[in-house]
A protein has these predicted regions:
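Beta-strand->loop->alpha-helix junctions that form or flank phosphate-binding loops
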Residues: 44-45, 182-190, 306-314
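C-terminal and late-domain segments of enzyme folds
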Residues: 118, 276, 290-308, 319, ...
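Cysteine-nucleophile active-site neighborhood
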Residues: 332-402
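Structural motif
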Residues: 12, 94-96, 126, 158, ...
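Phosphate-binding active sites in nucleotide-utilizing proteins
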Residues: 279-342, 346-351
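Intrinsically disordered, low-complexity terminal tails and inter-domain linkers enriched
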Residues: 85-91, 243-278
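ATP-dependent carboxylate-amine ligase catalytic core
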Residues: 2-24, 30-121, 125, 129-156, ...
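Internal gly/pro-rich beta-alpha loop/helix module
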Residues: 135-258
Length: 469
């Protein structure tokens, strides 16, 4: 583990509430700074999968999440240092917040909030402020945000949706009164929007050409409206990052010895797992299954697996030699017909007798049908879209042994979906939380709606590779 201090410039992009323009500014900053020739490390507070996709496109390296609830507060700074080091050391890290600056896990007094993460990584905050229908009161709002928690340093403001030059002058003068510098101003007419869906933005993988255009437009916008030198000065005011870098090899305790070979798969120059002689773990990817944390593949590789992505929309079969399968989240409901049309892969997954781990979208895909379209039939359930959004952090207890859990273990995860399954859980459920059973353990299959970040549960990766024996 690296343990010496690293003077990593870093800044947290936050807001008083959702909808103020954090993603616009953070993504634009990443793209604009990269155009300057800087190596930029992108990060996102919270469990969200979609924003990091845009961040990664803008920065040219994977977007990574920093979530104290999912991984534990002690791992947040090490994960930042790891992400900013792979595949090469970054010149600056940009961390987009979640919701409002002080909004975190319900009833936990700001735990897992953007403010909490800002203190854990000792980074200054750049506050994005929607100024629609606001004048001098904007300064009072910023003053309150700054004073609410004295450990959080609000180092500057970017004014968003400014109505006119006169409006901008009024806002700048008011913020000067409270001693908070304005580092940029974006007019209402200059806004750039990315298409949205019921769970947020449309993932990058589903609209690659359009996503490139949106990210380029955001970089143009920020370069034209934000004082990038002032933002860099703010980021450089962060003290050295003294936390040791998170190490996937140390987290899993080294490679597992298996019949198919036990050498560690390692990591390529691009940050992905290298292909070696370890057991092949197939990981669903493509437009329908975009929800995955970068550390999942790193942990599997460190445990000795060869990680092989496959696209259930296009690939007629699992990668050669597959010993285990991981199917994460995404939007299968938007691709149900195309998934149904790949009958050969559905049949192979239905008959696959190795360990399978599925989260949310993966759960739906393993069922008999989704909104009437045939799926794999590996699990005896049907699924359908509803108008109700189920979301939030969960504290769960494993209800049974499985390829990745042991009965009685406690984990922290999150749910985020608008679908339901019938039945809601199997005879042997995967989890128990909120006084109810959830998910399915069926033979060597573990499937549920719960998303878990494996950096907080590294034994899951090790166990899955062990289950390949």
């Amino acid at each position: 583990m690296v343990s010496t201090g690293w003077a990593l410039p870093r800044v947290v992009v936050a807001a008083p509430a959702s909808g103020h323009g954090k993603t616009t500014v953070a993504t634009g900053l990443l793209g604009a700074l990269r155009r300057r020739g800087l190596t930029v490390s992108p990060h996102k507070v919270g469990p969200d999968y979609i924003d990091p996709g845009y961040h990664g496109l803008a920065a040219g390296r994977p977007g990574r999440n920093l979530d104290p609830w999912l991984v534990g507060p002690e791992r947040v700074a090490p994960l930042l240092r790891h992400g900013a080091s792979v595949p090469t050391p970054a010149d600056v890290a940009v961390i987009e917040g979640v919701m409002g600056l002080h909004d975190g896990a319900v009833g936990r007094r700001g735990y897992a909030s953007t403010a909490h993460v800002a203190t854990l990584v000792d980074a200054p905050v750049l506050l994005v402020l929607d100024t629609t229908a606001q004048g001098r009161s904007a300064a009072a709002l910023v003053l309150g945000m700054r004073a609410f928690d004295e450990r959080v340093r609000v180092g500057g403001v970017i004014l968003n949706r400014v109505g006119s030059p006169r409006h901008e002058t009024l806002l700048r003068d008011a913020l000067a009164e409270v001693g908070v510098p304005v580092l940029g101003a974006v007019s209402r007419s200059a806004e750039v929007a990315a298409p949205s869906r019921h769970l947020g933005l449309v993932p990058v993988a589903e609209r690659a050409p359009e996503s490139l255009a949106v990210v380029a437009a955001l970089a143009d916008l920020v370069a034209a409206t934000v004082d990038l030198d002032a933002v860099l000065d703010l980021a450089r005011s962060a003290p050295p990052l003294t936390a040791p870098a998170w190490d996937p090899l140390a987290a899993v305790g080294g490679p597992v010895s298996t019949a198919a070979g036990g050498g560690p798969a390692g990591v390529t120059a691009g940050g992905g797992p290298a292909r070696t002689g370890g057991p092949t773990v197939a990981v669903a990817a493509g437009a329908a299954f975009t929800f995955s944390y970068a550390e999942t593949a790193e942990l599997l590789a460190a445990a000795g697996a060869t990680v092989a992505p496959f696209d259930p929309l296009r690939d007629p079969g699992l990668p050669a030699g597959t010993r285990a399968v991981v199917i994460g989240g995404g939007f299968p409901e938007a691709h149900a017909d195309a998934l149904a049309g790949n009958a050969a892969l559905r049949a192979e997954l239905a008959a696959f007798d190795g360990p399978v781990v599925a989260e949310c979208a993966g759960l739906l895909y393993l069922g008999r049908s989704l909104d009437g379209a045939p799926m794999c039939g590996r699990l005896d359930l049907t699924a359908r879209m509803t108008g109700r959004l189920t979301l939030g952090y969960r504290e769960a207890v494993a209800a049974a042994d499985s390829p990745v859990t042991r009965a009685g273990e406690r984990v922290r995860g999150h749910e985020f979906h608008r679908t339901v399954t019938d039945p809601g859980h199997g005879d042997t459920p995967a989890w128990r939380f909120d006084g109810a059973a959830h998910g399915f353990v069926d033979g060597r299959v573990h499937a549920s709606y719960l998303h878990v970040h494996w950096a907080g549960q590294p034994h899951a990766a090790r166990r899955l590779v062990q289950a390949c024996r």
